[in-house]
């Protein structure tokens, strides 16, 4: 089974306001509410790719219940920890020429809540996969990623980490199965300017030397690079298409990679290409890409 962990899920409220005027009454002309968070995005994409997953994390109050309900409507299993104090955050994304975002805070997660999460994680079995992604709320310890990886390290669990800076660097010694920085995040980690594919490959190998098993680096319109556990380097340009929505493209890439890895019994070349196809298909779509959209792009990449 695949498990995804989102520490601070959100109820995302996307609104379109034509000719927004600050300080005056404005009316929306289009609106949509959906469950948000990096791990949740991975679960949604896995579902689109016909893979089951279980969404873990913390929710609170009516907004949290709505997050769970929206996922269950998609057929995604949820085992969220219900927090007593506060409410799951609402993130407002307003489009009016430019996009403005206002993110909520989230609930007050206690040590007792963390213990309950650890209880859920202790139920994972050998052969399961766990995706840990996104930021850690201020009410949680900074080393949450490390604590979780230490908790499952004695089991044969493939842990995927999609995080930035110290959250990522501090778990490399625990040998995550897959990490997925983008080229800008790679630059931040090493404090250098990374401008070429050769630079990306060099520093991806540096992360591998620090303990990562597989390093997948997304480079936006410039494509992607994978340095797999055998030392083989895979590169690919980005498929051609019109960028519609970049939100969730990286999470879609993670889901696509996992899907490709599982369905090919560990073929990294196929996993890499399906990851790119999934990320690109979502970037070219208003919503997360469908399996058919992904397969069409994957087929064009393999011709």
What positions do the PLM features span?
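Positively charged, low-complexity intrinsically disordered leader regions
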Residues: 1-23
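Substrate-binding N-lobe of the ribokinase-like
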Residues: 27-87
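Gly/Ala-rich phosphate-binding loop of Rossmann-like dinucleotide-binding domains
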Residues: 47, 153, 262
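Conserved phosphate-binding/catalytic loop of the ribokinase/pfkB sugar-kinase fold
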Residues: 83, 93-126
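Short beta-strands and strand-loop turn motifs
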Residues: 101-103, 128-134, 162, 180-185
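Charged helix-capping and loop-helix junction motifs
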Residues: 115-118, 142-149, 195-201, 236-241
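Conserved phosphate/ATP/ADP-binding segment of small-molecule kinases
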Residues: 146-230
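Conserved phosphate-binding/catalytic region of the ribokinase-like
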Residues: 197-303
């Amino acid at each position: 089974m695949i498990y995804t962990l989102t520490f601070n899920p959100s109820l995302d409220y996307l609104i379109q306001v034509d000719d927004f005027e600050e300080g005056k009454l404005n009316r929306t002309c289009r609106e949509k509410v959906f469950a948000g968070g990096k791990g949740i995005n991975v679960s949604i994409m896995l579902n689109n790719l016909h893979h089951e997953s279980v969404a873990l994390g913390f929710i609170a109050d009516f907004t949290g219940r709505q997050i769970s309900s929206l996922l269950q409507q998609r057929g995604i299993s949820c085992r969220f920890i219900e927090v007593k104090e506060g409410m799951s955050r609402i993130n407002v994304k307003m489009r009016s020429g430019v996009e403005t975002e206002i993110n909520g805070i989230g609930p007050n997660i206690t040590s007792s809540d963390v213990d309950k999460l650890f209880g859920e994680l202790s139920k994972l079995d050998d052969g399961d996969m766990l995706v840990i992604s996104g930021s850690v709320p201020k009410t949680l310890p900074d080393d949450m990623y490390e604590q979780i990886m230490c908790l499952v390290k004695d089991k044969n669990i493939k842990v995927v980490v999609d995080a930035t800076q110290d959250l990522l660097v501090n778990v490399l010694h625990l040998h995550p199965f897959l990490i997925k920085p983008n080229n800008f995040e790679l630059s931040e980690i090493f404090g250098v300017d990374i401008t070429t594919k050769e630079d990306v490959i060099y520093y991806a190998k540096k992360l591998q030397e620090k303990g990562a098993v597989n390093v997948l680096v997304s480079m936006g319109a410039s494509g992607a690079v994978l340095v797999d556990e055998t030392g083989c380097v895979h590169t690919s340009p980005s498929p051609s298409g019109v960028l519609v929505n970049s939100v969730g493209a990286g999470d879609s890439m993670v889901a696509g990679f996992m899907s490709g890895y599982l369905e090919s019994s560990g073929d990294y070349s196929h996993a890499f290409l399906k990851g790119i196809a999934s990320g690109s298909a979502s970037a070219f779509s208003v919503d997360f890409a469908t399996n058919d959209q992904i397969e069409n792009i994957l087929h064009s990449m393999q011709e």
